[in-house]
Structure formats: structure tokens, C-alpha cells
Regions:
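Helix-to-loop junctions at the C-terminal end of transmembrane segments
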Residues: 155-172
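A membrane-interface helix-boundary motif in multi-pass transporters
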Residues: 15, 34-58, 171-173, 210, ...
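Intracellular loop-helix junctions on the cytosolic face of multi-pass helical membrane proteins
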Residues: 1-140, 315-375
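Loop-to-transmembrane helix entry
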Residues: 12-15, 50-51, 132-152, 215, ...
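Hydrophobic core of transmembrane alpha-helices in multi-pass small-molecule transporters
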Residues: 202-237, 241
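Glycine-rich segments within core transmembrane alpha-helices of 12-TM secondary carriers
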Residues: 12-37, 147-154, 264-284
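C-terminal ends and interior cores of transmembrane alpha-helices
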Residues: 180-214
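Loop-to-transmembrane helix entry/capping segments in MFS-fold secondary transporters
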Residues: 7-16, 139-141, 243, 249-266
Length: 375
């Protein structure tokens, strides 16, 4: 909220956040399979984690320092809400009532949880080990190529989501590209249901004699690539939308509470991330395994259904919940323009000596504002 309230700038956060994700999560995903080969037990070995964990810690520290540097200049009371330095502190007892009356924030928390759950489960290492290793029988030859293809497909979608957000609002962008992911994953689901009927119904990129790609693989790359690109580009989109919900609360009540909103959203985000590992563990137990499978474990009967549920069905249900929640989300592109204009007018009036209560009563919609705020 303090960095910018420009509807054309806020969506850019997803691009910068993705660069950070690629440096962090992307680096870990890239190095993990390479390091796992050097340790007996692969991903389950203590040596693997002793080597990989410091890499993640160093990357996290560097990215955190960049975040602190980025917000340092704007993290001042004069940029806080309508009242600036005069903004009153909110009591803890008021938080529940504020969230209860902020319907857009409630819906966004559902949407954010859905997007995060889909990404966390579908990209879980155990799920990918079962898919590319246990089912397809070639983890080393499929995981990295598919990961790279997924990132390649995501690039145009990041540009599209930002452009759509700038022109139509973040709600329209989120719903449009989550819908794309949902439709594409219907194709992925069908392909996984057909798996195992013959050698033609399995993923194959490279064989003993070179390139050995088949129609099944081409279709999988198309559906998975487009679907992954769409949902990876929208996975972090709810984060800048929290700022919209905070601005709405300032518009609605005059209170400035981005901290509590960000904390609540982050809490849901972390709970969902933790839940994803639990869901994977419970699902794996249904096929009789006592430990999480690695890329070297053989296929166990019923494992394909576990993969179908974790890799396709749960993400699809999560996306459906996101679309349902966002359907009633009131902060469209046009509404946010009005909110920003009204807040700006009130802020200037309070800075010039008007009481906050008077400013809140005097300006409540775009047509009530002076001409300079309506442009």
C-alpha cells in the first residue's frame, strides 16, 4: 500500500516476485535432483539436506535484504492511509470486526488459499517422483525437462496477467488465467487416466537412440505447459490484491490496517503450504507405503490414482473454489479507480486540516469529487 497505489504498477509485483521465486524455489528445484544422485537414498538422505539447506538459507537472506532495501524509503508514517502521521492505532479488539466487514478480503483469502494449495501439491517433490519416476520410469530424463518447459510456458503468461490486470483489473486477470489452467488440466487428467494401456500411453522424450517423443508426450507437454504456465503466473497474484483490500478498508472505514491484513493472508498462506505436505503424506499411505517414495522406488499398484488426485483433481477443485470466491469479489478495475481517487481526495483534505470524520462523510463516490481527482 505504501509502495504504490497505481493500478498499472501493482500488478508488476507478480513479475518481481516470480524473479525472486525463480532464484529461490527455482534454484532449489534445479539443484535438488542433481545433488540427490550423489547420495544413497536420494531425497531421503541426511547428506542431501545438509548440502541443500545452506544454499536455500543464503538465497533467502539475500532476497530478504533486497526486500528491506526496496521498502526502506516508503516505510514512513506520512505514507500511511488517509491520516498519514495522524493515523490512529487500531486496537486488537477491532481486528475481528474489521475483517468480518471486509468481504473482499474474505474472498481473497479463499482465492489465495486455493491458488497456493494447487501450486504446493502439484509441485510437491514426492508427487513428481511418483509421476515421472514410479509411473513413467524415467525421473532423471523427465523432471528437469518438464520443469524447464513449465517455466518457459509461464513467461508469456506473466506478461499476459500483468497486461490484463493493468487494463481490466486484477480480479479479471486472476479469473481468466485460473480458468485457462482449469481447462488445460482437464486434458492432463484425461491423459493420466489413459496411462499404462500400452507403451504409447507413457511419457517419453529421449530413448537409447536419441529423440523418442510420442503423441502422448506432445499432448501432455501442451496441456501441462499451458496449464502450468497459467496457474504459476497466478499463484502469487492474490498478494498485491491484499493491498487493494487494505485500500478498500481505508475507503470503507478510514482505518489503515495493511499489517493485519498482510499477516492474516500470510498465515493462511503458510497453513496451506504446511497442509500440502500433510495431504501428500496421507494420500501416499493409502497405497500401503510406510515412507514417502523417491525417484528410485518401483511402481506400487494404485499409485497412479494417488498421482491423479494430487497432481490434477485437488488443484482443479482448488481452482474451482478460487473462481467461485472471486465471482463475488467487488474490487474490479473500475471500483479500484474510484477507491484510489476518493482516498486521495480525503488524504489531501485531512492534510489541510479537515477532520477525518468530515472527509469520510463529504466524499464517498467518484461523482462527489473535485474535477482534478476524477481525471
Amino acid at each position: 500500500t505504501v509502495l504504490t497505489n497505481d493500478p498499472k504498477q501493482r500488478p508488476l509485483f507478480t513479475i518481481f516476485n516470480t524473479v525472486g521465486s525463480l532464484l529461490g524455489m527455482g534454484a532449489m528445484q534445479f539443484f535438488a535432483p542433481i545433488l540427490a544422485k550423489n547420495y544413497e537414498g536420494g531425497y531421503a538422505s541426511a547428506g542431501f539436506f545438509r548440502t541443500l539447506a545452506p544454499v536455500g538459507i543464503v538465497i533467502s537472506i539475500l532476497l530478504t535484504l533486497l526486500a528491506v532495501i526496496g521498502i526502506w524509503e516508503k516505510d514512513q508514517p506520512k505514507y500511511f492511509g488517509i491520516g498519514g502521521e495522524k493515523t490512529e492505532k487500531i486496537k486488537v479488539s477491532e481486528y475481528i470486526q474489521i475483517i468480518k466487514n471486509n468481504d473482499p478480503m474474505q474472498r481473497l483469502m479463499v482465492a489465495g488459499a486455493g491458488c497456493k494449495l494447487a501450486l504446493s501439491i502439484a509441485t510437491n517433490t514426492t508427487v513428481l517422483c511418483m509421476l515421472y519416476g514410479c509411473m513413467m520410469g524415467n525421473y532423471d530424463g523427465l523432471y528437469l525437462p518438464m520443469m524447464v518447459l513449465g517455466y518457459v510456458f509461464s513467461v508469456p503468461f506473466f506478461l499476459l496477467t500483468v497486461r490484463t490486470s493493468q487494463k481490466e483489473g486484477q480480479k479479471a486477470s486472476l479469473m481468466k488465467y485460473v480458468s485457462v489452467a482449469l481447462v488445460c488440466y482437464v486434458g492432463v487428467l484425461v491423459l493420466l487416466l489413459l496411462w499404462g494401456r500400452s507403451d504409447a500411453f507413457t511419457l517419453s522424450i529421449m530413448g537409447n537412440n536419441g529423440l523418442s517423443i510420442n503423441l502422448y508426450t506432445i499432448l501432455f507437454i501442451a496441456f501441462f505447459g499451458i496449464g502450468y504456465g497459467a496457474y504459476y503466473a497466478t499463484a502469487d497474484m492474490p498478494i498485491p490484491m491484499v493491498a487493494d483490500c487494505s485500500d478498500y478498508e481505508t475507503y470503507r472505514s478510514g482505518k489503515y490496517i495493511p499489517g493485519i491484513m498482510g499477516t492474516l493472508f500470510s498465515l493462511v498462506d503458510k497453513l496451506v503450504s504446511s497442509l500440502s505436505a500433510t495431504v501428500v503424506g496421507i494420500a501416499v499411505s493409502f497405497v500401503g507405503l510406510q515412507s514417502l517414495p523417491t525417484q528410485y522406488d518401483p511402481y506400487t499398484p494404485g499409485m497412479n490414482w494417488v498421482v491423479i488426485v494430487l497432481f490434477c483433481i485437488i488443484p482443479m477443485v482448488a481452482w474451482a473454489a478460487t473462481l467461485i470466491a472471486m465471482k463475488g469479489y467487488s474490487l474490479t478495475g473500475e471500483k479500484m479507480k474510484e477507491i484510489q481517487a476518493v482516498n486521495a481526495c480525503r488524504r489531501d483534505a485531512v492534510a489541510n486540516g479537515m477532520k477525518l470524520e468530515e472527509a469520510m462523510t463529504k466524499w464517498q463516490s467518484m461523482d462527489q469529487l473535485p474535477a482534478e481527482y476524477r481525471s
